[in-house]
Amino acid sequence: MAAVRVLVSPRLASALLPLSGRHRTTSQRAAIHSSAPRPRARVALVLSGCGVYDGTEIHEASAILVHLSRGGAEVHIFAPDVPQMHVIDHTKGEPSEKESRNVLAESARIARGKITNLAQLSAANHDAAIFPGGFGAAKNLSTFAVDGKDCKVNKEVERVLKEFHGAKKPIGLCCIAPVLAAKVIKGVEVTVGHEQEEGGKWPYAGTAEAVKALGAKHCVKGVTEAHVDQKNKVVTTPAFMCETELHHIHDGIGAMVKKVLELTGK
């Protein structure tokens, strides 16, 4: 068969060459090989010890870390360098009378050692702050477990909450931790779940009345939901205030983390 010659203009021939055979401009090379990295939200996670009855609820802290990781956040973990209110033997649910522990040292267990004194946390260096629950929030970060509506909040915790709120940076809280925002941020909207026990499904339903007594607005939400106070940029979810399957709690925390990250704008 006779060969067929196809006449192609030099300009068209250049266009038909594979990319690897053509000269590229700097901007073309950049567009092909890379893209501008998306800024990562810097999130401070504030712990209150290690263990549901006298510190941080470990499952909540872990769920928060998983969802922050999935959301691409850069996480820094903090805790106050103060003694725990007391130590609970978690096999019995009773105080260990002769034992004392430090909140920062205990929180380091969850942080795998990568933790900083809360006194060094600055809102200027972070885009958001998140507080897991566990009774440590009501015993070590505040005196809510003992004093209810007349409670005091740890001075560093109060400072951090006021700094982030004043800078209009989002704050996430779950389980019992929303009482901290209720005490510090006037008129804030939070949820601790439902307001009736409903046959034991919501064993801490009475906390809703305490939230109201602190001057906050309580918003009823299910365990898989998060409430967003758009004005104050405070996001809350019930977590273990509800007796339910772990994956429901995990989903609710995911909703909270997602909203917090959205509010950072990153």
Curated annotation (Swiss-Prot):
List-wise, which residues carry N6-acetyllysine?
K149, K155, K162, K201, K217, K221, K231
What's the protein called, per UniProt?
ES1 protein homolog, mitochondrial
According to the UniProt entry, which residues carry N6-succinyllysine?
K201, K221, K231
Specify the domain of life of the species encoding this protein: Eukaryota
Task: Decide whether keyword Transit peptide is in the record.
Answer: yes
Q: Which family does it belong to?
A: Belongs to the ES1 family.
* Other comment: By 2D-PAGE, the determined pI of this protein (spot P2) is: 8.9, its MW is: 25 kDa.
Enumerate the InterPro entries for this protein.
Class_I_gatase-like
Q: Which UniProt keywords apply?
A: Acetylation, Mitochondrion, Transit peptide
Q: Which GO terms describe its cellular component?
A: mitochondrion
Keyword Acetylation assigned to the entry: answer is yes
The subcellular location is: Mitochondrion
Per UniProt, the transit peptide runs over 1-39
